[in-house]
Amino acid sequence: IPDIIHNFNLSDLAMAGFIPTSFFLAYAIMSIPAGLLIDRFGEKPILFGGFLMPFIGTILFACMHTYPMLLASSFIIGLGMAMLQTVLNPLQRTVGGEENYAFIAELAQFMFGIASFLSPLVYTYLIRELDPATYTAGKGFFIDLLADITPREMPWVSLYWVFTILLLVMLIAVGVSRFPKIELKEDEKSGSKDSYLALFKQKYVWLFFLGIFCYVSTEQGTSIFMSTFLEQYHGVNPQTDGAQAVSYFWGLMTAGCLVGMILLKLIDSKRLLQISGILTIILLLSALFGSKEVSMLAFPAVGFSISMMYSIVFSLALNSASQHHGSFAGILCSAIVGGAGGPMIVSTLADATSLRTGMLFILVFVGYITFIGFWARPLINNKTVRLKDLFKQR
């Protein structure tokens, strides 16, 4: 965000907030249509399309470096991500079993966390290697190639070329792979318009929709603005220590997913959600009002404390429904538009008052997520084992 504000001369944080807004707005638009497309064309074509859209989006901005193109690129990438999310969520529940869905979803979140942890590190590496003040030819074929095709004053654009290459590899892999025919139960298919209308009449659907919205608002509101907060209040360099803090945020989220996979086999998911919420509130308050040292520790630690929230809320939601699980998954995926709403709320409040005040609103999102742990009544609880059973002799 700091680099984007600087390179495009954006006047306020709200302008920068339009970037995640354009990305996550695509979720609200594409999630339900993606489910209908899966029913018509099958999983593999939509999976391929889910990688094709981000490929188009990344290569567009990599070639045309303007703020409007960045917004368009983010939107196109978001469309593809919505397609991928809608394809994969019901399949996870089918392959892993209903009682293990929270665990499988946590495993998927773990893989997401690894990629998110590595991304800021790659960003820092590319910024350092392509810095126009220090770059000299001969650093290696790949770095020299990126230097030739990336604007000297915008070395961070090189990250888009890296994404383009990775997405091309995924397109080839999906294209040549033999995708098995997966028979979903009738209630796991995306369903007709009537199934969506029936779900929209259910109170719990809207309550869980709001839960996913609040989670993504929390995740994005924290990760997007923590570097800017550390720069404004503690003088932290956003390209080095700030980027490292963001990397640690995602790295600790990855570690939290590993811990979560174990805890979900031992403790009821609702109790874990309550504990995670209370811990997150404590960490956010420490990050926003603590010293530089405390903030540098507390912000990344939020990644650990929220790591189980998404998979738990999603599994509680689907396991609270007796039918139309595929359609419900599409509705829940559209709630990822919270990644647009959360940063916009934070940035708007920050421009009107201060960034600290804006980020305090994240506590409202966390409070609601914590509340879900008290009122949720799933039809199927996550499968747990007792510790003493693990040590019984065979």
Predicted regions and their residues:
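Conserved MFS/SLC helix-loop-helix module at the cytosolic interface between two early adjacent transmembrane helices
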Residues: 29-68
